[in-house]
From Swiss-Prot:
Homodimer. Gene3D superfamilies: Clc chloride channel. It is found in: Cell inner membrane. The chain crosses the membrane at residues 33-69, 77-100, 124-141, 148-166, 215-232, 253-281, 288-309, 330-349, 355-376, 422-438. This is H(+)/Cl(-) exchange transporter ClcA. Residues 70-76, 233-252, 310-329, 377-386 are periplasmic. Signal peptide: none annotated. The record marks E203 as: Mediates proton transfer from the protein to the inner aqueous phase. Its main location: membrane. One of its GO terms (cellular component) is plasma membrane. It is a multi-pass membrane protein. It comes from Shigella flexneri. Proton-coupled chloride transporter. Functions as antiport system and exchanges two chloride ions for 1 proton. Probably acts as an electrical shunt for an outwardly-directed proton pump that is linked to amino acid decarboxylation, as part of the extreme acid resistance (XAR) response.
Length: 473
């Protein structure tokens, strides 16, 4: 019987096949691999920058409070020093922004969104130092601002710096790394990697170009930035509120009511922010001296409040555990809420380098706690815990204001480590988002970006008219 024997590959054929395989690998486009490698570099640098920024803010705040200790015996002098220390730090931040990089003012997140749409420039060589040191001044002075805005804008600008240094070309690389830097900045600011990823997918969904390479790059950047954060900090929840009880199913309707309240308040808060921007702009009129002095007055006011009523100023992270634990009376909660709304509007709308995430988390906590205390009194049969409403409220204002409910929910869960409250948080966030959309107003960052682009267009038109007039003469 005749059997077939397999033909053996000759050594020459094997060598030829290996050469063809090597040639194919060498000729293959290396751009995706380069982007992923650059994403790791960007994430590492952003994480280190976020850690340095956080440590710098903490050091300045400690130095400022240490200076007050030496004047504790003289109350009028103590108040004067409290005002001046914060005012000088704030004026330093305002001056840097106004003089050297106006685009570094405010949150910075709308600037990154505009850059992703190719409508705003990314001048990293001036934004990075101004945002970093200007943010140190305003946040170190105790103003009612958050650190996530600076770290997101710093992250986006670091990505552009890496692109320029390594001369990586192409729109895909630029767009992908810009989104990676922004996500890494948010993740490192709050030790919340999943929230950083969702922030890009949800909040920046109109600008983010979703591809397999871009989402992998965002993942890698967020992982590296979070690792850098955790190397220099502990792997614990950023805000320690303890383990709260779960929400029984028969109480979930209360969280929907809470979401409706935030759905009403969110668009109103956005209108207040934009209205305060207009009011403060009329005050300084674009004059750098008036603008810096106005910023100093706002910063000094926050410094005074930080000494007299600490719960009413600053980013609000120290307030959240105290409010969640139920250590404030209803009257005190109302006072803190009103005072923090005012300080947040003044600080953020004035163009100070700083974010609004953290202040909104604090406002949501206070309003949620107040609602929880009322619910505890009205429905004793439910055996409610006011702290669960505080946690649900933390992300609800974000959902209503910037229309990013998933980001708000996951951010709060990662920050507080109370994952058992995910269902009431989803209900609260959904109620807040749906009602905010129904009432009309635009998301806060979108409205701010639209204003920035309108101002940019007006300035370009004015320059073109001036150029035409000079040519005619």
């Amino acid at each position: 019987m005749k059997t077939d024997t397999p033909s053996l590959e000759t050594p020459q054929a094997a060598r030829l096949r290996r050469r063809q395989l090597i040639r194919q690998l060498l000729e293959r486009d290396k751009t995706p691999l380069a982007i992923l490698f650059m994403a790791a570099v960007v994430g590492t640098l952003v994480g280190l920058a976020a850690v340095a920024f956080d440590k710098g803010v903490a050091w300045l705040q400690n130095q400022r409070m240490g200076a007050l200790v030496h004047t504790a015996d003289n109350y009028p002098l103590l108040l004067t020093v409290a005002f001046l220390c914060s005012a000088v730090l704030a004026m330093f931040g305002y001056f840097l922004v106004r003089k050297y990089a106006p685009e570094a003012g405010g949150s910075g997140i709308p600037e990154i969104e505009g850059a992703l749409e190719d409508q705003r420039p990314v001048r990293w060589w001036r934004v990075l130092p101004v945002k970093f040191f200007g943010g140190l001044g305003t946040l170190g002075g105790g103003m009612g601002l958050g650190r996530e805005g600076p770290t997101v804008q710093i992250g986006g600008n670091i990505s552009r710096m890496v692109l320029d240094i390594f001369r990586l070309k192409g729109d895909e690389a630029r767009h992908t790394l810009l989104a990676t830097g922004a996500a890494a900045g948010l993740a490192a600011a709050f030790n919340a990697p999943l929230a950083g990823i969702l922030f890009i997918i949800e909040e920046m969904r109109p600008q983010f170009r979703y591809t397999l390479i871009s989402i992998k790059a965002v993942f890698i950047g967020v992982i590296m930035s979070t690792i850098m954060y955790r190397i220099f900090n502990h792997e614990v929840a950023l805000i320690d509120v303890g383990k709260l009880s779960d929400a029984p199913l028969n109480t979930l309707w209360l969280y929907l009511i809470l979401g409706i309240i935030f759905g009403i308040f969110g668009p109103i808060f956005n209108k207040w922010v934009l209205g305060m921007q207009d009011l403060l702009h009329r005050v300084h009129g674009g004059n750098i001296t008036k603008w810096v002095l106005m910023g100093g007055a706002i910063g000094g006011l926050c410094g005074l409040l930080g000494f007299v009523a600490p719960a009413t100023s600053g980013g609000g992270f120290n307030l959240i555990p105290i409010a969640t634990a139920g250590n404030f009376s209803m009257g005190m909660l109302v006072f803190i809420f009103v005072a923090r709304v005012i300080t947040t509007l003044l600080c953020f709308s004035s163009g100070a380098p700083g974010g609004i995430f953290a202040p909104m988390l604090a406002l949501g906590t206070v309003l949620g706690t107040a609602f929880g205390m009322v619910a505890v009194e009205l429905f004793p049969q439910y055996h409610l815990e006011a702290g669960t409403f505080a946690i649900a409220g933390m992300g609800a204002l974000l959902a209503a204001s910037i229309r990013a409910p998933l980001t708000g929910i996951i951010l709060v869960l990662e920050m507080t480590d109370n994952y058992q409250l995910i269902l009431p948080m989803i209900i609260t966030g959904l109620g807040a988002t749906l009602l905010a959309q129904f009432t009309g107003g635009k998301p806060l960052y979108s409205a701010i970006l639209a204003r920035t682009l309108a101002k940019q267009e007006a300035e370009q038109l004015a320059r073109s008219k001036a150029a035409s007039a000079s040519e005619n003469t």
